[in-house]
Amino acid sequence: DRVRKLTAAREKKIGILLPTGSGSAIANLAVTLDQRISVNLNYTAPPSSVESAQKQCEIETVLTSRKFLEVLPKLPLVQNILYLEDLLKDISHKEKIQALLKAKLSPARFLIGNRPVLPDDIATILFSSGSTAEPKGVMLSHHNLLSNIESFRSVISPSRKDVMLATLPVFHSFGYTVTFWFPLLSGITTACHTNPLEAETIGKLTHQYKVSVILTTPSFLLAYARKIKPEQLTHLRYVFTGAEKLQPRIAELFEKRFGVKPLEGYGATELSPVCAISLPNVEIDNLPEIGNREDRLGRVLPGMAIKIVHPETTEVLQPGEEGLIYIKGPNVMRGYLNKPE
């Protein structure tokens, strides 16, 4: 409601500049429930990339925090900035009670109002870093995100008792879909920390909240293997990595220290982002089910199809041959922003 009151009706895209945590979660929820398009700005990218993302999306308003801006280098933001500190301070006790009752008791159609959300409506735009060229905006629809979440959920079968660690930034597709929306829509408790590099603090967090599922990058996983104590991860069930290649030495180091084998996934921002994932090897009725191999990226998620083709002839290649990857599925992006070609 507050976002709706403080922004113009013409503003379809709202910028968000916040680290992982309750603030970014609430901001993204507010924008999505108001049927706007969230644009989580990459605060680690060059200032020119942040400026480019705002211009491409024609952003007029950015949600952020004064405290967070104090620790960032100066970034070129639009003039209309809404600070979470101010928004929280202005919310009366009566409004809090009304919001609680609305969230607990109101049917979904009441929250949405007379503006139904269509599956192909754009939910978010995620940008590349823009380190070598102008950042590209990847447009992901509600259907893209929900289909990817459902496919991911069907293969890892999370429990309501699970607790997931969330440290990846929401401007990254892995953090946005897998460690923000996935646990939220699966009823899983999430333990958040703003900086994935602070391994010792994260170790205390995982112990305090009995974290059972970790989704992170191999680089961060290496830091955890070196600095987190084994007794801090006694409840750990699954570790999944993405965004970069999982080196065998990192997987072996982590498994030796904590007794849980990290499993590698594959994807891209354009795929919402998960496409394939390795799973634990299991045995059912004395029949082995192979879920992962060292020389493979894993199983394709349900609902998707992959083939490897020759880059010039598009002829389908045999297993083991190198070529272009063709991927088909409901998770494939709607396209690049302002680049219909």
Which residues are covered by each model-predicted region?
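Conserved structural elements of the adenylate-forming
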Residues: 1, 104-110, 119, 138-159, ...
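Conserved AMP-binding/adenylate-forming
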Residues: 2-45, 167-169
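Structural core segment of the AMP-binding/adenylate-forming
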Residues: 2-6, 33-100, 112
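Conserved AMP-binding/adenylation subdomain of ANL enzymes
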Residues: 32, 146-163, 171-212, 227
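Conserved helix-loop-beta element of the AMP-binding
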Residues: 58-60, 76-89, 163-165, 191, ...
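Conserved pre-ATP/AMP-binding loop-to-beta segment of ANL
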Residues: 82-89, 94-127, 133-134, 157-163
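Gly/Ser/Thr-rich phosphate-binding loop
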Residues: 211-216, 225-292, 305, 314
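Conserved beta-loop-beta connector loops within the AMP-binding
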Residues: 303-326
